[in-house]
């Protein structure tokens, strides 16, 4: 990557301890504005406020509802920190956020929580980037990937918060608006490997679900759809959180192919899905589908969208 690459203008913090909330806030705001001590003070302030509201005059010593010893902070702490910048966080499942849920690309940024790990999806210019402190740096995302990723993790019960308000202007905003980041070139060897994997993916999924001939994708958008779908498959133990994005891409794509070859609904199989947050299921909500049934539904939705894209392209011709 060249030193002059616009992506290098994006402020990025690497993971330290479990300070992902601090890193997420600073990367969202594009400056090293918050330290652990600042968020700790906010957490203590939030605890005292909650104790007063609940009338709990004798709280458990050393216990906090808004932080833990490892450095994790609650969404309430992040919300309080962003109030200074007139920014508001609203769960995408809130009925008021229906427009963002239907068209995620209309937002400027999202703060996401997966297994108590905070990271950011943020727009600079007209391009989306993943700012995740466990990665080596900012990751350029396609619009298709952003939409598919947010839809998938939201449907699995993870916490996605829409950032509302005007984000502080940064050098990266100005530079990338003028000079968009060019996606990295794929080497011939890597491209050949990707085509082979994609062909197998579409053939197996297409034949399993009756989605047509299962021809390999011939557009970048269709490739993005497949990769985004594969990326949504994560293991139950959360081991991916510490691995590089490139390793996760390849591993999850392989898993998606394996899942497409698993027994169908008439022969239930144990299929790893994104685990559901305990607090994410609203009271009175129905129990989630079985793993096999949910996986079948997700694959069916993906194939329907893929076939629709092909039909639209054929109509244009």
Curated annotation (Swiss-Prot):
GO terms for molecular function: cysteine-type deubiquitinase activity. Changing residue 20 to A: Loss of catalytic activity. In a cdc-48.1 (tm544) mutant background, causes an increase in longevity and resistance to oxidative stress. Residues 7-178 form the Josephin domain. It comes from the Eukaryota. Its EC number is 3.4.19.12. PROSITE patterns: JOSEPHIN (PS50957). Residues 254-317 are annotated as: Disordered. One of its GO terms (cellular component) is cytoplasm. Disruption phenotype: No visible phenotype. In response to ionizing radiation-mediated DNA damage, the number of germline apoptotic corpses is increased, ufd-2 recruitment to nucleoli foci is impaired, the number of ubiquitin foci is increased and rad-51 retention to DNA damage foci is reduced; the increased germline apoptosis is suppressed in a ufd-2 (tm1380) mutant background. At the higher temperature of 25 degrees Celsius, 60 percent of animals are uncoordinated. Shows resistance to heat stress characterized by an increase in survival and expression of heat shock proteins such as hsp-16.2 and hsp-4. Residues 296-299 are annotated as: Interaction with cdc-48.1 and cdc-48.2. Expressed in germline (at protein level). Expressed in spermatheca, pharynx, dorsal and ventral cords, some head neurons, hypodermis, body wall muscles and coelomocytes. Residues 219-239, 247-264 form the UIM domain. Forms a complex composed of deubiquitinating enzyme atx-3, adapter ubxn-5 and cdc-48.1. Forms a complex composed of deubiquitinating enzyme atx-3, E4 ubiquitin-protein ligase ufd-2 and cdc-48.1. Interacts (via RRDR motif) with cdc-48.1 (via N-terminus) and cdc-48.2 (via N-terminus); the interaction with cdc-48.1 is not required for atx-3 enzymatic activity. Interacts (via C-terminus) with ubxn-5. May interact with ned-8. Acts as a chain editing deubiquitinating enzyme that binds and cleaves 'Lys-48'-linked polyubiquitin chains, with a preference for chains containing four or more ubiquitin molecules thereby modulating protein degradation by the ubiquitin-proteasome pathway. Probably by regulating the IGF-1-insulin-like pathway, regulates lifespan. Regulates germline DNA double-strand-break repair and apoptosis in response to DNA damage by recruiting E4 ubiquitin-protein ligase ufd-2 to DNA repair foci. Interacts with key regulators of transcription and represses transcription. This is Ataxin-3 homolog.
């Amino acid at each position: 990557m060249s030193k002059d690459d616009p992506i290098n203008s994006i402020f990025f913090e690497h993971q330290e301890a479990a300070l992902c909330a601090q890193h997420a806030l600073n990367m969202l705001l594009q400056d090293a504005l918050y330290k652990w001590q600042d968020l700790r003070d906010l957490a203590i302030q939030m605890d005292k406020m909650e104790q007063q509201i609940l009338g709990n005059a004798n709280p458990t010593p050393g216990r906090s509802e808004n932080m833990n010893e490892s450095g994790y902070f609650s969404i309430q702490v992040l919300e309080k920190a962003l109030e200074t910048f007139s920014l508001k966080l609203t769960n995408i499942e809130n009925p008021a956020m229906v427009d963002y849920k239907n068209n995620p690309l209309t937002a400027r940024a999202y703060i996401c929580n997966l297994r108590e790990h905070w990271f950011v999806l943020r727009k600079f210019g007209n391009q989306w980037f993943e700012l995740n402190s466990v990665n080596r740096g900012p990751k350029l995302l396609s619009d298709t990937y952003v939409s598919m990723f947010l839809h998938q993790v939201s449907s699995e019960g993870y916490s996605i918060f829409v950032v509302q308000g005007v984000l502080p202007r940064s050098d990266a905003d100005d530079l990338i608006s003028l000079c968009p980041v060019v996606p990295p070139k794929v080497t011939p060897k890597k491209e050949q490997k990707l085509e082979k994997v994609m062909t197998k993916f579409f053939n197996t999924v297409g034949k399993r679900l009756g989605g047509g001939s299962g021809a390999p994708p011939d557009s970048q958008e269709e490739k993005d759809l497949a990769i985004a779908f594969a990326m949504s498959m994560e293991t139950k133990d959360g081991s991916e959180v510490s691995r590089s994005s490139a390793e996760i891409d390849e591993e999850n794509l392989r898993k998606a192919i394996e899942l497409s070859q698993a027994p169908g609904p008439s022969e239930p199989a144990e299929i790893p899905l994104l685990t559901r947050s305990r607090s994410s299921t609203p009271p009175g909500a129905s129990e989630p589908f079985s793993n096999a049934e949910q996986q079948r539904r997700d694959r069916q939705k993906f194939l329907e969208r893929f076939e629709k894209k092909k039909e639209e392209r054929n109509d244009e011709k």
